[in-house]
UniProtKB/Swiss-Prot annotation:
DNA-dependent RNA polymerase catalyzes the transcription of DNA into RNA using the four ribonucleoside triphosphates as substrates. Binds 1 Mg(2+) ion per subunit. Keywords: DNA-directed RNA polymerase, Magnesium, Metal-binding, Nucleotidyltransferase, Transcription, Transferase, Zinc. The RNAP catalytic core consists of 2 alpha, 1 beta, 1 beta' and 1 omega subunit. When a sigma factor is associated with the core the holoenzyme is formed, which can initiate transcription. It holds the Pfam family RNA_pol_Rpb1_3. Belongs to the RNA polymerase beta' chain family. This is DNA-directed RNA polymerase subunit beta'.
Amino acid sequence: MKDLLKFLKQQSKTEEFNGIKIGLASPDLIRSWSFGEVKKPETINYRTFKPEREGLFCARIFGPVKDYECLCGKYKRLKHRGVICEKCGVEVTQTKVRRERMGHIDLASPVAHIWFLKSLPSRIGLMLDMTLRDIERVLYFESFVVIEPGMTSLERGQMLTEENYLDALEEYGDEFEAKMGAEAVLELLRAIELEKEIEMMREELPSINSETRRKKITKRLKLVEAFFQSGNKPEWMILKVLPVLPPDLRPLVPLDGGRFATSDLNDLYRRVINRNNRLKRLLDLAAPDIIVRNEKRMLQESVDALLDNGRRGRAITGSNKRPLKSLADMIKGKQGRFRQNLLGKRVDYSGRSVITVGPTLRLHQCGLPKKMALELFKPFIYGKLEGRGLATTIKAAKKMVEREVPEVWDVLDDVIREHPVMLNRAPTLHRLGIQAFEPVLIEGKAIQLHPLVCAAYNADFDGDQMAVHVPLTLEAQLEARSLMMSTNNILSPANGEPVITPSQDVVLGLYYTSRECVNGKGEGMVFESVDEVEKAYRTKFAAIHARVKVRITETNIDENGERSESRRIVDTTVGRALLSRILPKGLSYDLVNQNMGKKQISKLLNTCYRQLGLKDTVIFADQLMYAGFHYATVSGASVGINDMVIPDEKYTLVADAEAEVLEIQEQFQSGLVTAGERYNKVIDIWASANEKVSKAMMENLSSETVINREGVPEKQESFNSIYMMADSGARGSAAQIRQLAGMRGLMAKPDGSIIETPIVANFREGLNVSQYFISTHGARKGLADTALKTANSGYLTRRLVDVAQDLVVIEDDCGTFEGLTMKPLIEGGDVVEPLRERVLGRVVAIDVMYPGTEKVLAPRNTLLDEAWCDLLEEHSVDEMIVRSVISCDTDFGVCKACYGRDLARGHIINQGEAIGVVAAQSIGEPGTQLTMRTFHIGGAASRASAENNVQVKNAGTVKLHNAKHVTNSEGKLVIVSRSSEIAIIDELGREKERYKVPYGTILEKLEEASVAAGEIIANWDPHTHPIISEVAGSIKFVDMLDGVTMTRQTDELTGLSSIVVMEVGQRPTAGKEMRPAIRLVGADGNDLMIPGTEVPAQYFLPANAIVNQDDNAPINVGDALARIPQESSKTRDITGGLPRVADLFEARKPKEPAILAEYSGTISFGKETKGKRRLVITPADGSEAYEEMIPKWRNLNVFEGEKVERGEVIADGAEAAHDILRLRGIHKVANYIVNEVQDVYRLQGVKINDKHIEVIIRQMLRKCEITNAGDSQFLAGEQAEVSRVKIANRELEAQGKQPATFERELLGITKASLATESFISAASFQETTRVLTEAAVGGKSDKLRGLKENVIVGRLIPAGTGYSYHQKRNAAAAAGTTTEAAPAISASEAEQNLADLLNLAGSSD
């Protein structure tokens, strides 16, 4: 018995390891793995089904087919363990060795490994410094290569064709040696002396001038160094021995009907073996060279196909015309080893079923069908039945459960009590997609789900299915209860707001209850307590909406948790008084004394959580839900066609709009406006008509006039069901009501352009055929979009998770003084995000002072909670520096202080929290809600009429930001720069509003002027882009020839003529090279200069520009020389929604990026070329000037002689993130990406905390480029991990040596994932072949730092509850001891268990 135990213990002993190293295998190593050579291509004997000897399934090489039984049957049973049968040569052992024992094939001729040959850049090619084509010609026997030139004029590695070779033979005889095939490459590789090569290249590098050559040598140097340091030998890239996979990993399975299903690998191996054997025979026979050569080539091709089928030439196909799955295909892709089996596995003890509503459940419960529970908890039930003596053996218990005897149900109740189960709904987009509940047994076959958790699961009850999983061990149950219980996940990790807020019916019920109505039954009564109100309501003395006075009792909790009661009389309604009964003690009555819409309810829950904590909130949420359902039922809110009230004004408004459109049409026909302008104006007219109709409709819907108690008519909010649903936030929106009762309005075509005839009808009136047809456009596009969106969103989430998966909180405080500067976000006249929302839950990096004093308001390292934020707001702080993960100094992780508050828990984050994954999920999860396209409301085009002025909302003073302006003849300012902004500053100097104003805007106020609220301070024409004159003079036309570069159009009505510049494509040949322009000359006929510069005032005219001035006409400063009609609403395709987010995270360069100044200095223009101008920046310190060529069609924002700062915009366009990082630094680029991503989400009304985006940006910035290596091991121009460089620099500084300098680099998320230190993580993400090839050549070792690597090797992850395990391991490793993975039970216990098992096995037979 003891031996058996020892033996079992030996089997279960695990090896401890701290990393995984990958390298090239030498032929000897492959032979040492092998248990024998596979010599025959046969698999199994088709009659006996026994494996053939020396074949691909040979039992002698790979082990026995049956447990503890040799092939011929001479030795059976455990007692012969380890014996090798003398008859058939099979070792008696377990069958599972067939999963681990490898064989080998001795190749008759060496073969190149295709990965190192074809995976770019070709490693063999780089090593030999030959091109891939040349090497392939040698390998596939098309030409010779010189190996040993001897005393001849040939060079080593020179290619020779067949003829050249024969000529050389005649000339030199056997002085030299040249070969073809893999042997030749093998000898070349073997001859390389790595150390010498490294020395040579290192000496050569500094003296090289050509950039390309230097790049090439650096690349080769890196490769050679990698080989040298890893101990790999170059010749191992050529295979002499081929390993054979264990047979159970490429199984051969008999199907019924005597046929076999086999893995494709067996076919590929058989090909290799056949060709190899044939080649051996040919070599023995000394066959003619050409035949041997052909056979060697075929062998090379068959090994290629085995390793990576389809990498070179056509893929080898099987009998079903499908390419065979090679070894490389087994590990890559979604169905490959990594993603199918290692990162996600199927689990036992799970079931799935349809879900239905469980409105009677508590928040921590779910309804589990009895049938499912019985199946899921079977082992527990067996155990209990035996323990209670109801069943003698497991078999008896099994029979009882199958018969479903009554005792079984009692036992099931006991087993289930307080045993949480996990519910999961696919797709699991964030961590709230799996939550734990306590099961409640129910009849029926559907799982019941609590309505409040639907939002987190994104579940509805139209046939959704959910899966149930049972945590088995005590630890698993504990984790499920403490971490995953639905009651512990009240706040969303994405934004820290309650995620269990009521929706739909519940909201409608609560809203209905809390509404007030004029002259309701019982209005004006006074009650002494809430109980009395309830009495009056139940006895029908008071209607639920009646306004009454009630004395209420409130519980106040002060800072120390002391409770005190206070009473007061409030004006309220019956319904609100009833709601206050479920309000937890300690909350103010004012929270329910209002119309309870969705927002108010969410705020109420949030306040409850912050003031009273988790338990009260959970109970309260349930109570709210029950109340909501109850009152929604009682209210009888329903929808009838009469509820959609069409306003009477609609018809006059529509008629007015039609008249306006006709007028525009006439103007167009008489040539006053261009087609584009007409289109734009028409669309504007209809957009504003639509707005007016919907406004009239909402006013009509939202209020009604009733007679009050005094008999006087009084206006009150309407009780129209549709209006109540939209107003409360239960269902529907103003836009949808507009389509029901207003007019459907403008529709978009699938390409996003707007159809100019709107749908005047609404759904109540009904659509005619043409209107219906126009509608289908947008609707169909919407459906197609949704399908695409889901896939794209999932892929974005996957990339995000992959880049951020190894980011974990690993220390308390890194002590950095850096951080991000936070200001309120202002767009137009609104504060989009006040400062408090941006800094809530962050840590202060540098003391915040009372504004205007030296007194500290919030000291460094304060965690800003709600109270602190109130304080900051009180003292109107509008700028401060907070800690951020981007500037955190921790290596391989972040610290608690830089992250701040854990949004889902409401206190500072814990160590071991996997913030990377949480961030990725928070950004990815709402991805499915983001639109793919810029417009869409059921296909209706949402486009406000174009803005043409700035109207101020607050009084204050005007301030201009990077605006250049000239003063026109009327004394008004005209803006002549492009990215200008106007800000309004209040008396405290805080910015209240900020507006972007286009080129050509006319300002009504000067800078520093004070304005009143509602004043219009700027005007411009939204449909044309003017060209403004900056000097006064007279016009000279340049290259303006009628019929060559421009056409004249005369208006019949007015007789005015205008000039239109022709497009290049439409000009005759003579005009192709001409560049039409307007030059300004003075009275003396000489060129005028642009003010303050040496540049002549000459304005180039783009195609389609309209000039209303004549040659030699006088012109004033600030007048328009020409106007360029702006194209229709689709001007610049603004990438909206999801693609925009993906572009930002991938750090893609925009098509026409803005050009930024590379240095600070003075601008001048050098010699022009045909299509470009030369921009020169001369730095102020007199160092070398910087030159850049800029295409002429780019609009420049700068003039000659102007001073620019580094990073300022020179030519407009979308800014590229890389440029911002290079020229303005890390904080600016972080701000840019955060704001741009937030813009997209804000548009959809999704709230995400900035922290999450910053976490991803930190990962995008984790690489840097070495600019100067100093005394370090790095090479200049090498890409390295920032944390590595920092660690190396610390060591160098400690020794007094010179540290390396580096520049941060911004990588897109895909690139950053592939550039991670861990090759396992990168290989399981994308481009598996390339990653593994690179890692093997460099002999990389994976330290298993991230989450993915640990999941793949089957360990606890170094985050969450597995964090402490890894901490202990790391501590032990640092101390130099290896921790032995101890078995969980002692030997004596194991012995007892085993004895019991054996008894059982014996007795139940």
